[in-house]
């Protein structure tokens, strides 16, 4: 099994193969990807769709001297396997294992780290220009999907690249007609307009009826139809940017890919190759439902993904999705916005029930935020559902277009904190710090499912921009209450009171997901725990009361310490005059790698044991560690 694949330790081995061996190699590589992902979990559909393209690129180009930049990067498993990491696939996305995305520190073949969308053309152009300035004769290649091409950054790069006539730059559009959510907007409609016109559809149907008795001729007509799709675009779009457009060609046909790429190597100036692929190619279940198989956990390939036998705890994403539908039912002004993450953000049901109030703006976070601001000026109640890591891409719009004008936009910030297998590129480590410094913002962090629901309701009532952050995955198991209750603005709550005497009284001020482990630590130490709820406005009154009645304060957040929620507590304490020693716990000042979320939190000292250990070492000097009975306040 994998007889050919076992002989490939790097692309030089690949280039020694006879062309006739490449398709059998592709079959083995596709089977290996499927087997590997089924055992570790990871991105599947996209990787099954890039097998032949990956082989062709490494076969034709002299990698790593020629540079390949993979946009988004979750489709790089075939690339990793062919570049010396075949045996490492068993550790994919696991702690101390190989990343699910390209990483420069992992391999010289990973020429540029990616994970966020639409960055590849800019990076590849920089490499092409840099190589020219250094006197190096090499190609720089950007592989970008049709979903990523909807983002403004991709067109900014193309606009810049088009005037670089001597750059050895190749942009490959991997057109699979499906990003995570279906591509949207004028560009994708433009690509499809010729093929969906009434006259064209009627003519095609008539021709197919006539040619149905001649299958070879019908197949020729279908191929001509595919090429007609490409005829519309170059003259009006890609070539207007200064690129030489080639395609579309079948991205699964090595006999088409390899000669085309070999010809492109002889050309100068920016080249644009349009390849058509299919997500899930070669695995019928993934072909039929590429969204389901976009990022599965472990599964049996023979049976496919099966629903969980026992109902799991409700995820925070589900809590958000249910709240949004309930809020929209009560208020016709509520609208939902997602930057191409309908499934991931829990908006599938909302789209079905309220299609006229659902806006998928594509991979366009900047536009999403300013679009929401515009809606707010007309009296609507926009809710932007966005991952913490992707909100970073729209920071200027958040400040300039929303906060500066004090517009009532709700930001439902998913994937806050560590995200596990996706690693540092997708972690929501910075939102508390970069949000709390913005005037007019209200910022909340949910500690359980019901609190998340009620915070979202509270956010919708505010006259200013408001953010609610919540983590990836399942909640604590707390039931959500259907009835809405507005949480008092800027008010936390004490969840546990210490019974320790003066000199040993510790108060833990916990935010969001850190409330549960802080309570566990407090049980071991007999400490007070406050669920702070609000990062901005911080509950200054509660902070000062705890400072006055305790000897030590500890702040705990699942975010960066510098400028974060703990800093807000320290500022409030200092202003109150009752200064106490403070220990600020949070994510370390480094990028936290991929792995099991619970293990990562423990590694960062943010589980119950880690929090207790840090407090003992800092304040209690290893003495009096026996806890008295817990005293929690409802």
From Swiss-Prot:
Substrates-to-products reaction catalysed: D-glyceraldehyde 3-phosphate + pyruvate + H(+) = 1-deoxy-D-xylulose 5-phosphate + CO2
EC number: 2.2.1.7
Binding site residues for thiamine diphosphate: 74, 115-117, 147-148, 176, 283, 365
Positions contributing to Mg(2+) binding: 146, 176
Cofactor requirement: Mg(2+); thiamine diphosphate
Molecular-function GO terms, alphabetical: 1-deoxy-D-xylulose-5-phosphate synthase activity; magnesium ion binding; thiamine pyrophosphate binding
UniProt pathway annotation: Metabolic intermediate biosynthesis; 1-deoxy-D-xylulose 5-phosphate biosynthesis; 1-deoxy-D-xylulose 5-phosphate from D-glyceraldehyde 3-phosphate and pyruvate: step 1/1
Pfam families: DXP_synthase_N (PF13292), Transket_pyr (PF02779), Transketolase_C (PF02780)
Enzyme class: transferase
Subunit structure: Homodimer.
Protein name: 1-deoxy-D-xylulose-5-phosphate synthase
